[in-house]
Amino acid sequence: MLSSKLLKSLTAGVFIIGLGVTLAYAAADDQIKARQAEMKGNGKAMGALAAIMKGEAPYDAAVVKASLDAMAAGDAAANEAKAWDASSMEGATIETWAKPEIWAEGSQVGAKYQAWVDARTALAATTDEAGFKAAFPALGAACGGCHEMYRKPKG
């Protein structure tokens, strides 16, 4: 029979291990939620920008700036939360559309991310509707290029 002291130690050890596993799951889930929040915010911003591009909304430099600022803020928040770290896939309990290939050796995700940052920067440098319409397609292509390779189909 186990001594009371040994039983308490084992119980505490099991509790600590369980807590660690729970925290790992919670951390991974929080990372995925941060990643999803970034993508949702980017989608909203892209919707506003696409409406201008399609002529569904008038060109408005303030809307362009606010949309790009929202993307940059979402990116910074996701980076702070380590939303794109491979650890976000370890022990997650919520669904994600991110493919594991993002973190595979030889992944092009870093180059795709840089193309998105560069396209955002170029669009932010535009000063009028003509410049916006010339620069916007690169941003859409950067988003789509990453999604085609690294996002699972939704549904």
Where are these regions (language model features)?
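Bacterial N-terminal signal peptides that target proteins for export
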Residues: 2-13
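Sequence context surrounding c-type heme c attachment/ligation sites in exported
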Residues: 29-155
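Sec/Tat signal peptide C-region and signal peptidase I cleavage site
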Residues: 19-27
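Core hydrophobic alpha-helical transmembrane segments of single-pass membrane proteins
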Residues: 14-18
